[in-house]
Amino acid sequence: MRDESEDARSARLLAPVREALARFEQETTVPVLAGPWLGEVGFELLYWIPFLRWVVSEFPGLRRQLVIQSRGGVESWYEGLVTRYVDLFTHVTLREFRERFGKFFKQTDTYDGYTQAAGGRDYSEAEQAIIEIVRREVGAERLNVLHPSVMYGAFKHIQGSPERAFAAYFPELTRPPVSGFGLELPEQFIAVRFYECFPLPASEANQAFVRELVTVLADTLPIVCLNTPMSIDRKHPDFPIDRIESVVTVQQSMTLANNLAVQSAIIGQANAFVGSYGGLSYLPPLYRRPSFSLYSDGRSLSKTNHLALAQSVLGKPKLGSYWVGSIEGMTPRAVADAVLAS
């Protein structure tokens, strides 16, 4: 295969995936579970959902068969894909989730290592439990399973498609309505969520920077803090935000089953989003909202393709702006000026 072209190699490596998807499409009466999905928000927005959009573009019949499973009320993220959506958080408590499914949060730093073929795996006990929850909810005798491991193995080859074609898998989303959550939002505001992660550790210096940044921003526009009342992912606790004037909290409107739905609705209405570099920062551009995310430790960013991919597709003219910067050598005032000028 020494002389094999990149296109030929991608086609060869995608062949088992296509064969499995074609089999699923032929079984028209059997629902296809897209999942079990319990990965991080960033992987869902940047990889999983675009992969599913590729799937239905290549196999249109699967659109009618897909059953989307996720958590936190993110059905709107799958706009144009979903006819049936099952939210795990309507079936389990937070304690049950941690005890039974917490290990699902572990992700790889890069999707290059995943080569699992469709239909070729034994499911863990936790995965089997989720598959059974979905099967019962949709009332099916059995499900075909489109497992995320298929996406990790195939995505790098899908990403090799022409840039314009690949960007089509990141369409503009309809901004979700804020009605129904009991929210009282300012007419104009900035949505803020900072949480601990590898790029932005919760050091004293970083927390001080964030506190000053929020204070400076709040002098001009109200701040809506997206911190959640429950610690769903203990690896990424929220930075505390001072309860100062012009800072609005929305924890009273959040439940386990709707926390991401609430955050999505608020981000869609915000003048801008400001937060840690990571998963949630990928969402605002899909609503044509500017996103500003910060990091202090760039070492983790250099090990993956995530940032390069986000910058290449989320800053497209049809979407909102996507800005990522290091707080090293910057001042809170400089960041605030950039946000307020957007």
How does the language model describe each region?
Residues 30-33, 189, 272:
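Structural motif
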Residues 113-195:
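A nucleotide-sugar donor-handling region in carbohydrate enzymes
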Residues 1-20:
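Membrane-proximal basic amphipathic "stem/tether" segments
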Residues 281-342:
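Nucleotide-sugar donor-binding patch of glycosyltransferase catalytic domains
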Residues 268-274:
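Acidic donor-binding loop of glycosyltransferase active sites
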Residues 18-24, 30-136, 262-265, 280-283, ...:
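Active-site and donor-binding regions of nucleotide-sugar-utilizing enzymes
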Residues 78-95, 237-254, 289-291, 308-326:
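Active-site regions of enzymes building and remodeling cell-envelope glycoconjugates
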Residues 71, 187, 192-197, 208-259:
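Catalytic donor nucleotide-activated moiety binding site of glycosyltransferases and closely related
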